[in-house]
Amino acid sequence: MKENGELVHFFRDKNYIMVNNDLGSGSFGKTVVLQDPFIDELFVAKKYEPYYEDDRKAFYDSFLQEIKIMHKLNHQNVVRIYNYYAYEDQYTGYILMEYIIGESLPDYLETVCTLGDYGEIDNLFVQLIDGFQYIESQGIVHR
């Protein structure tokens, strides 16, 4: 048995099934949908893999900082981070996040605006502001 303060290393690899290999992408990587076959749950995985190779090492510490900050957040209007996988020797990694079922925000807004449901737009706006107020109350500035 390990003593308090000693590092505990888990040997089992965690495997996921790729459900959607192209949920989204940006200048610092892409997002995919994975399924944990053991608990039968979907997750979004954000892979840190900058488009430019020179950026990989330069922004890796920012990626790790994002993990630390986001993992502390717990609010109904902020996507939850459940786990992370950091590969420091390769300057890459993954953030495993809550998967929210539904259409993309732009598609949803287009549908709501087309229907003229301005009450729903107001409701969505209130939820957005509520989430940002929580983030700001935690001393975090969203960019």
Regions found by a protein language model. Name each.
Residues 35-43:
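Conserved N-lobe loop of protein kinases adjacent to the ATP-binding glycine-rich P-loop
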Residues 55-72:
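AlphaC helix of the eukaryotic protein kinase fold
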Residues 20-27, 31:
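Protein kinase glycine-rich loop
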Residues 130-140:
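Protein kinase catalytic-loop region centered on the HRD/HxD motif
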Residues 83-85:
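A short, aromatic-enriched beta-strand patch in the conserved N-lobe beta-sheet
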Residues 124-125:
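Activation segment signature within eukaryotic-like protein kinase domains
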Residues 89-104, 108:
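Conserved short submotifs of the Hanks-type protein kinase catalytic core
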Residues 46-51:
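Conserved beta3-strand ATP-binding lysine motif
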